[in-house]
C-alpha cells in the first residue's frame, strides 16, 4: 500500500470516535482508503472521495472562522478536495489558505480533530456523492487578514457557540466540542 494511504490509515486508526456516528464514518473512510488510490480522486463518485477540512481558530480570541458556501448555501468550515497532496492535513491547509487569505495558518495538532461522511448534492455535471471528510484544527495569529474567496458569500469569525448554531449539524457540533476541549479558549 502506498505510504500516503498507509499514513492516513494509521491516523484514522489512532483517532478515537466520539460517538456511534463518527465510529461509522471512520469505518467508511478506512474502507475507502484501503480500497485503493482512487480514494483521493475528486472524480471518484461511488461512493465518493477523501476531502480535508479545517476549523480555523483565532489564537487570541478562540473564535472560529466559517464561510458561507456559495454553492451549498450553508455555513461551513474551510476545506475541499485533494489536489495531489494525498494528505488531508495538507489539503486542509491549502484550502484554508486559499479560502481565507490567511498565510500564517499552522496545525494546532497534527492529529485528526474529527471525521465525517456527508452527502453532496448533484451540481455542475457531478452526480450526488459523498465527501469522506478528515477534519483538523488550524490556528492563526492574524484574524484581520481574511479575504473572502469567490466560492463564498461571506467569511466571518464566530464564537464556538455561534458557529454551532450557524452550522446546525451533529458532525460540526462534535468537532466544535473537541476544538473547545483542545484549547484553553472559552467562547463568549
Predicted regions and their residues:
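Predominantly extracellular/luminal regions of secreted and cell-surface proteins
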Residues: 1-28, 100
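Acidic, metal-coordinating catalytic segment for phosphate/diphosphate chemistry
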Residues: 16-53
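Short glycine-rich, low-complexity/disordered patches
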Residues: 23-26, 136, 188
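Unchanged
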Residues: 83-174
Amino acid at each position: 500500500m502506498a505510504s500516503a494511504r498507509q499514513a492516513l490509515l494509521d491516523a484514522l486508526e489512532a483517532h478515537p470516535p466520539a460517538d456511534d456516528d463518527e465510529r461509522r464514518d471512520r469505518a467508511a473512510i478506512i474502507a475507502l482508503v484501503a480500497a485503493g488510490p482512487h480514494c483521493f480522486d475528486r472524480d471518484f463518485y461511488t461512493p465518493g472521495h477523501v476531502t480535508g477540512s479545517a476549523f480555523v481558530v483565532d489564537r487570541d480570541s478562540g473564535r472560529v472562522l466559517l464561510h458561507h458556501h456559495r454553492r451549498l448555501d450553508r455555513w461551513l468550515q474551510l476545506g475541499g478536495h485533494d489536489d495531489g497532496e494525498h494528505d488531508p492535513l495538507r489539503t486542509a491547509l491549502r484550502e484554508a489558505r486559499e479560502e481565507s487569505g490567511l498565510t500564517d495558518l499552522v496545525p494546532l495538532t497534527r492529529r485528526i480533530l474529527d471525521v465525517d461522511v456527508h452527502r453532496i448534492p448533484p451540481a455542475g455535471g457531478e452526480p450526488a456523492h459523498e465527501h469522506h471528510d478528515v477534519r483538523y484544527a488550524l490556528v492563526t495569529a492574524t484574524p484581520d487578514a481574511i479575504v473572502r474567496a469567490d466560492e463564498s458569500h461571506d467569511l466571518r469569525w464566530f464564537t464556538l457557540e455561534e458557529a454551532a448554531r450557524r452550522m446546525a449539524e451533529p458532525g460540526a457540533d462534535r468537532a466544535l466540542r473537541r476544538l473547545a476541549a483542545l484549547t484553553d479558549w472559552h467562547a463568549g
